[in-house]
């Protein structure tokens, strides 16, 4: 891949037989029992480049991935560049249903740009628009603001971008900076992932209350509204009819969005009911997990193994 000086692969699980490395630029590091955020920090500390690109082990990068992002760092104020993680074309239909739900604006609102290419030009981005499966970071900025916070996963990239933007650096979204991301199949594996996203967002909200987004509030309100329907039916019919009307409107909007998402995602219309159901369950799962996590008295770090603060030096990896 042109423009790539080195490739550092970090495995946070023990590997008995390391893979065969066919490129001299590739290094494989094994650091068992590190959290995902700690493993990312180890990758940063073990690399040498000024611009560090991140992707995941379930992604395939586009051939123009690097060239679409690196030139933007000629602006010294640009600290982060990223783009969408598009559903991999070889995914199974059940995985593509999950992808269609994520790509739908009615499904993930402004965060849909993480899962589908939005717009035609480069633009300023917020923490909700980018993901670590497709992100480029400037090393000197990380040395100023710190690395990934090990106590947060997922949403560790959201927390980092929040700190970066608070320092006045630019964060850019590039629609043609693409990786192809394998989705988890519906229903249980996908909803488990959504639940973890909500827990990470709740942890981020506890740390930065201003990071609470209206879209998160909407998912929480949906859960509370459904819980309130039986009670209001028995006590206050006027409120019940108002809530029921809102629910009907919500169902109509998500139904239409699921059909459109199937068409734009090149998914057969016969999967539309599944996509619609996935959007509904995704909202309920996200809102419920967020409320439960936020209501707990304390949120313990998800990282395991040795303490690895995001601002300190990492432990030495085992190199096979």
Spans of features found by a protein language model:
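Acidic donor-binding segment of Leloir-type glycosyltransferases
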Residues: 1-34
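Glycine-rich, basic loop-to-helix element that forms the pyrophosphate-binding segment
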Residues: 31-47, 68, 133
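Conserved nucleotide-sugar donor-binding
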Residues: 48-49, 131-145
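Short aromatic/hydrophobic "clamp" motif used to bind/position activated sugar donors
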Residues: 52
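Conserved donor NDP-sugar-binding/catalytic core segment of glycosyltransferases
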Residues: 63-104
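Short, flexible, basic/aromatic active-site loop/helix in glycosyltransferases
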Residues: 83-84, 89, 101-128, 132, ...
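Catalytic donor/gating beta->alpha subdomain of glycosyltransferases that bind UDP-sugars
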Residues: 149-212
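Membrane-embedded multi-pass helical conduit in multi-pass membrane proteins
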Residues: 222-299
């Amino acid at each position: 891949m042109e423009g790539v000086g080195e490739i550092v692969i970090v495995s946070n699980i023990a590997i008995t037989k390391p893979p065969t490395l066919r490129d001299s630029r590739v290094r494989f590091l094994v650091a068992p029992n590190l959290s995902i955020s700690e493993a990312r920090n180890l990758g940063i500390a073990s690399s040498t480049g000024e611009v560090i690109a991140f992707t995941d082990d379930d992604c395939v990068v586009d051939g123009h991935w690097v060239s679409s992002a690196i030139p933007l760092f000629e602006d010294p104020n640009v600290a982060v560049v990223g783009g969408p993680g598009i559903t991999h074309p070889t995914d199974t239909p059940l995985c593509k249903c999950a992808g269609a739900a994520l790509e739908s604006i009615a499904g993930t609102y402004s965060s849909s740009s993480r899962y589908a290419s939005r717009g035609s030009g480069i633009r300023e981005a917020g923490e909700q628009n980018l993901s670590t499966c497709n992100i480029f970071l400037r090393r000197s900025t990380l040395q100023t603001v710190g690395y990934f916070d090990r106590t947060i996963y997922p949403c560790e990239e959201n927390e980092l971008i929040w700190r970066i933007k608070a320092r006045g650096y630019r964060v850019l979204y590039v629609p043609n900076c693409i990786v192809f991301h394998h989705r988890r199949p519906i229903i249980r594996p996908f909803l488990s992932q959504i639940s973890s996203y909500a827990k990470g967002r709740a942890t981020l909200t506890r740390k930065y209350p201003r990071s609470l987004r209206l879209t998160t509030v909407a998912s929480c309100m949906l859960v509370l509204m459904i819980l309130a329907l039986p009670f209001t039916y028995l006590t206050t019919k006027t409120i019940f009819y108002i809530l029921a009307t809102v629910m009907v409107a919500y169902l109509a909007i998500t139904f239409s969005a699921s059909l459109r998402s199937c068409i734009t995602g090149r998914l057969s219309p016969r999967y539309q009911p599944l996509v619609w159901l996935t959007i509904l369950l995704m909202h309920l799962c996200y809102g419920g997990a967020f409320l439960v996590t936020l209501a707990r008295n304390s949120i313990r770090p998800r990282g395991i193994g040795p303490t690895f603060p995001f601002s300190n030096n990492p432990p030495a990896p085992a190199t096979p």
